[in-house]
Amino acid sequence: MKSRSRAVYSINPSVDIYKIGEDQVEFYFITTRRRILLDISPTLILALTFVDGRRTLDDIGQIMAIDSQELAPFFDYLLGQRVLLDIEEEIQDLSLLAKVDLDRYDRQINYFRSAYSGGAFSQTKLLEAKVVIFGLGAIGSGIALQLAMAGVRHFILIDGANMMSSSQERHYIFSHAEIGRAKVDIVAEHLSQIDPLISSVLYKEYILPDTDLGKFLADANFIINTLDEPYIGFTSAKIGRVCVQKNLPLFVAGGFDAHLMSTGELIIPGKTPCVDCYLSHFTTTLAGWKPRYNIPPIERELYEVKGRDIDFHVGGLASMALFSISYATITIIDYIVSQGDVKTVYGRGECLFEDLNINYLNVQRDPKCPICSVI
C-alpha cells in the first residue's frame, strides 16, 4: 500500500492516540481493543497532529518544512494498520452501499473499518450471504435474529417443530400467542420485522437418516446446525459430511443438553477438524464412560410423541443460551466478512458458569479421517 503525495488522510475515529514521553506513541483501537506501541521520532509525532481529513501528505510536509517522502513510510504503515484512513478510498468504499444501509449499519461499518479491509465492503459480504439454519430452538432462532440485525438478508430455515410452552424459558422469540405455531413461520416473521428486505425459504420438516440435504444447501454459502432431534451428533454428522463434499463452512452451535454455555465449533473443510474428527476424538476420550442419570423412570411414550412437553429437562438460563448465541454469531460474522480468511479457530469450548472461564477442547484433524483426510 503506497502513500500518494496528494492523498488526503484522516485518523480512524475509532482510534485513540496517546503520547508517552518524547518518542513513544500508543494507538488504541476502542472497538477491537488492539494496541500498537511505537518508538518514533518527535518529527513523526508532530506530523500526526496535522492529519485532519483535509490536508494532503504534501501539505503536511510543507507545514513542517520537510520532504513529504520522509513521512511516506510512516503513513504507509499506519494506513496498513488502519490507524489512518485514505479519504478517497473511504468515499469509494461507502459508495458500495445505499444511504439507507449506510445509516442503518453505521456503527457496524465503523467497527468493520478497524477490523477488516473496508467497512462498507465488509457489510456487503453480510448483505449478500445466504445462510442455512437447521433447527430453530433457543440457539438457532437466536442466531437468526442476531444475523438479521447484522445485515444477513437471505435465510433458509429448517425445523419440523412447533412452539411449546416450555420454550418460554430460553427462546427469545417466545410469545404465548405463538404456542402451537410452526417455529419456521414464527422466526421468519420476526426476521421480516427486523428488516423487510429479508427473504426466507422455509422447510417445516425434520432431518431423518434418508433426508436428501441437497435442496437445503443448493444456493447457500454458510451452514449452521443447532438441530438436536434426534440428537445433535447425528444431525451434525449427516450435515457435516455433505458440507465437506460441497466445501461449505459449517457452524455447529452450542447450547444443547448439558452444555448450555458451549461455544460450538466452526468447521472449515480442509482447515479445521471436521465433524467426524470430533466424533473420533470423543470416541477415544470418553471410552468406557457411562453416565448415570438420577431421575425417576419416565414412560417411553412421553419421548415418542412429538410436540408434547416433557417433564424432565436439563436445567439452564436464558442468559446461558444468549452466551452461546452471541459467541456463535460473532464467529459466523467474522468468517463471512473475512471471506473465510479466519486468523484463529478455537474449536469447541465451554464457558464455566462459576468463574466465566472458557475451556477449549484440543481437537486436531485426524490424519486417518475417512471424511476430511483426503482434502
Stretches found by the model and what they are:
Residues 1-375:
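Adenine nucleotide-associated cytosolic modules
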